From Swiss-Prot:
It comes from Escherichia coli (strain K12). One of its GO terms (cellular component) is cytosol. Optimum pH is 7.4. Active from pH 6.7 to 8.5. Catalyzes the decarboxylation of S-adenosylmethionine to S-adenosylmethioninamine (dcAdoMet), the propylamine donor required for the synthesis of the polyamines spermine and spermidine from the diamine putrescine. The modification Pyruvic acid (Ser) is found at S112. Its EC number is 4.1.1.50. Spermidine-deficient mutants show a small decrease in growth rate and increased sensibility to superoxide toxicity. The gene is speD. This is S-adenosylmethionine decarboxylase proenzyme.
Amino acid sequence: MKKLKLHGFNNLTKSLSFCIYDICYAKTAEERDGYIAYIDELYNANRLTEILSETCSIIGANILNIARQDYEPQGASVTILVSEEPVDPKLIDKTEHPGPLPETVVAHLDKSHICVHTYPESHPEGGLCTFRADIEVSTCGVISPLKALNYLIHQLESDIVTIDYRVRGFTRDINGMKHFIDHEINSIQNFMSDDMKALYDMVDVNVYQENIFHTKMLLKEFDLKHYMFHTKPEDLTDSERQEITAALWKEMREIYYGRNMPAV
């Protein structure tokens, strides 16, 4: 895409939001409580603040304010307000490729924010536990928050990821013509590294004329031992392993497709 000469500030708003899910099987009530306590501590407000602060570093934002809170009985939220950092637009990379892990990228941001909320969840029947984190990176300026996507997904390793990216508003060039997007994008997948693409099955649902892009990701490899909390698969009977595997896989497919499915 040809570089634009703008009249004034770049008024486009670029928002990246995604949900990550971690699935676990806990055999007893004590194990379920233990998993919730473990995942709640792993992604507490302090750790999330570190991750989001590093995200700000990647996209070159100045942190204005940090609001963070751990909740009882579980969950956490962090919101960071960031400000613009002047930069020569000629230095901004607008090509479609994966972002750093991490690597300094200079950005020009204004009226922007980064936030995350966590939602640990379990049910007394079935032994299934889920952890969901909602993350949003919203910027107003010349760089897309997609540059932080690669880093964030690697930091929050998960079984299922749903990603939405949208460009809103318009900016004008020096001739007064409106521009509703200022960079090329065909798929969110083009901003992911090859190792990530190898790990997940992905599907896109894009509405190009509205500048809306959506990608869903489901982990390819399924190893039961990675989904058990304080229970070893070898300590279970064959029928128990099959039953738990079927329950976990059904849970993951329901979350991935966003609908309830009949038992197989």
